[in-house]
Amino acid sequence: MKIANNWKDYKILDMAEGQKLEKWGEIILSRPDPKIIWKEKTYPKKWKEINAVYHRSKTGGGAWEFHKKMPKQWQIKYKELTFNIKPMGFKHTGLFPEQAVNWDWMMEKIQKSKRKEIKVLNLFAYTGGATVACLAAGASVCHVDSSKGMTTWAKENVVSSGLEKRPVRFIIDDVVKFVNREIRRGNKYDAIIMDPPSYGRGAKGEVWQFEENIYDLVELCTNVLSDNPLFFLINSYTTGISSKVLEDILKLTVNKKAKGTVTSGEVGLPMENSELVLPCGIYGRWEK
């Protein structure tokens, strides 16, 4: 498991009864996580310091309950990267801190490559954590997401990190349609990142289902890889999918186009002052 243990502005303070107690900068939030199936709190007193807690509804969805006054939006830093945080519907804050392990990896790959130009394609790019990381490392990025709101948020993160003059394109579109257009245009990328949802809809209502569509998308993306690709990353939070499946998909697709090293595993977040680690999804990586 790759553990995101280089954070200073984000911490898991405790975990119990299906909730994780997190510190985002100076703000303390309690959010649900189905993997926390134990009941015992390690630090009961810390739960009294909560700014807001997200309650899941039995009928789906849920709502935030605010205990203390807090800003609607604030910032946290990861190394030289700055992200805008705001609690929104369905428990999210606009950032997945466990992805820091992938940001570190891709930044190192880009910087150590010593190439003059590296073009990155970031699919299902959300609020742009990977976009910001790759721009900071010196790459150019094409950021694709079907949500206008998330894309605006990603632009804010780029500006907050002082990277607005770096070469970045923001595309609001269905990922599959966009990749097909790039194939027709003959555009190529040295690195591809994708963080597909379990289920989602494109900009015009196109349906995405992970199990049904992931293999075809990865295979499609091999047509926009350059002749000398640097890396290919798949992230997934889809329940019931093993990381080995992502590894196998990369071996059957990307590794046939360009021989490299394929690895996979889990990503996790450590709890402060504890040996506990919260599993937070899986990854598959192809790299030169």
Residue positions per predicted region:
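S-adenosyl-L-methionine
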Residues: 147-193
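C-terminal catalytic and target-recognition region of SAM-dependent MTase-like enzymes
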Residues: 229-288
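Non-catalytic substrate-recognition/targeting regions of SAM-dependent transferases
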Residues: 7-22, 29-97, 104
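Conserved SAM-binding loop of SAM-dependent methyltransferases across substrates and taxa
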Residues: 127-139
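Conserved alpha-helix/loop element of class I SAM-dependent methyltransferases that forms part
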Residues: 97-114
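Conserved SAM-binding motif I beta-strand of class I
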Residues: 140-145
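S-adenosylmethionine
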Residues: 175-255
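Conserved class I S-adenosyl-L-methionine
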Residues: 116-126
